UniProtKB/Swiss-Prot annotation:
Subcellular location: Cell inner membrane
Pathway(s) where this gene product acts: Cell wall biogenesis; peptidoglycan biosynthesis
Primary enzyme class: transferase
Keywords: Cell cycle, Cell division, Cell inner membrane, Cell membrane, Cell shape, Cell wall biogenesis/degradation, Magnesium, Membrane, Metal-binding, Peptidoglycan synthesis, Transferase, Transmembrane, Transmembrane helix
Species: Actinobacillus succinogenes (strain ATCC 55618 / DSM 22257 / CCUG 43843 / 130Z)
Biological processes, Gene Ontology terms: cell division; cell wall organization; peptidoglycan biosynthetic process; regulation of cell shape
UniProt-recorded name of the protein: Phospho-N-acetylmuramoyl-pentapeptide-transferase
EC numbers for this chain: 2.7.8.13
A single GO molecular function term of this UniProt record: metal ion binding
Listed Pfam families: Glycos_transf_4, MraY_sig1
Residues that span the membrane, as ranges: 26-46, 73-93, 94-114, 132-152, 168-188, 199-219, 239-259, 263-283, 288-308, 338-358
Signal peptide as annotated in the record: none
Length: 360
């Protein structure tokens, strides 16, 4: 929005030209989301307490979690509001990929809101009925993916990029829609599963979003993409603004979500942030890189799949409890230790993912 205003004012005041620089807008997007979060946070927490939007806790979970019952949840509303505001302020609103990303973010946020509200209303951890939850997640994903496909079909925007191999970039055609759907829905649920401890999900999200800001810039730059042997995809450079907004909003939320948490993001936040990471990965053609950089999310999801599969087939559990962060809690690890170690793993995987851009 401010890009258009600055462009108009530039003819009268040349100093407004600085707003056209992507790097300047990226930093301002991050700071805007961060400062808005710090300003909104206390007010949001107070409102959630007034409305009695408190967290429900599983009765079969770790005993240390019982004290979390009643902690304000649905703080993800703050995350979505600040990401959206910052993206609209500093992004180029003529860019279709900004709108696709916001559509998934807000669409998944709405689904998460209903899920959270039902948990609070009925005072259990069930939430939205699973089949309806996945139905609406799928509807939002397919609308976004079909739009993205129509924008980029028959171009490098629908090629598959394989890490470590510079010459393997097959054209996906219609399979792009299938792959993109599973990436978006899968990542959304993976982040949702990870959001079980104070700050556990938000910091890896910040790391991955920050890395994707760099990748989006490279993918949208003709010379840099050619140098790195990745496909040049027009429109993606503007996703830097969206990514840095996620970083700023995430850090602002962490201020209140760090152990012991004053507020939880709830499904309204985790489903939306996961969907946002998924759609960014698809748009910059780095689905495989998301698996590497989002390794903590993958690990949490795989632990649940293995636990459920093992119990159904052998009537035995592999872990004391899944997702795997609960396994370590039940082994006696203090919650902050689990969180910080998972953050360290996440940071290492993100750095590894960035290195693979050059190792081809």
């Amino acid at each position: 929005m401010l890009v258009w205003l600055a462009s108009f004012l530039e003819q009268y005041f040349s100093s407004f030209h600085v707003i056209s620089y992507l790097t300047v807008r990226a930093v301002l997007s991050l700071l805007t989301a961060l400062l808005l979060s710090l300003w909104i946070g206390p007010k949001m927490i107070l409102r959630l307490q007034i409305f009695k939007f408190g967290q429900e806790v599983r009765n079969d979970g770790p005993e240390s979690h019982f004290q979390k019952r009643g902690t304000p949840t649905m703080g993800g509303i703050m995350i979505l509001a600040t990401i959206t505001a910052s993206s609209l302020l500093w992004g180029d609103l003529s860019n279709p990929y900004i709108w696709c990303s916001l559509f998934v973010l807000l669409g998944y946020g709405a689904i998460g809101f209903v899920d959270d509200y039902r948990k609070i209303k009925y005072k259990n951890t069930d939430g939205l009925i699973a089949r309806w939850k996945y139905f609406w997640l799928s509807v939002v994903a397919f609308i976004a993916v079909f739009t993205m496909y129509m924008i980029g079909k028959d171009t490098d925007a629908t090629r598959l990029v394989v890490p470590f191999f510079k010459d393997i970039m097959p054209q996906l055609g219609l399979f792009y829609i299938v792959l993109a759907y599973f990436v978006i829905v899968g990542t959304s649920n993976a982040v949702n599963l990870t959001d079980g401890l104070d700050g556990l999900a938000i910091m890896p999200t910040v790391f991955v979003a920050g890395a994707f800001a760099i990748i989006a810039w490279a993918t949208g730059n003709v010379e840099i993409s050619k140098y790195l042997y990745i496909p040049y995809v027009s429109y993606t450079s503007e996703l830097v603004i969206f990514c840095t907004a996620i970083v700023g909003a995430g850090l602002g939320f962490l201020w209140f979500n760090t152990y012991p948490a004053q507020v939880f993001m709830g499904d309204v936040g985790s489903l939306a942030l996961g969907g946002a990471l998924g759609v960014i990965a698809v748009l910059v053609r780095q689905e495989f890189l998301l698996v590497i950089m989002g390794g903590v999310f993958v690990m949490e999801t795989v632990s649940v799949i293995l636990q459920v599969g093992s119990y159904k087939l052998r009537k035995k559990r592999i872990f004391r409890m899944a997702p795997i962060h609960h396994h370590y809690e039940l082994k006696g690890w203090p919650e902050p230790r689990v969180i910080i170690r998972f953050w360290i793993i996440s940071l290492m995987l993100v750095l590894l993912g960035l290195v693979t851009l050059k190792l081809r």
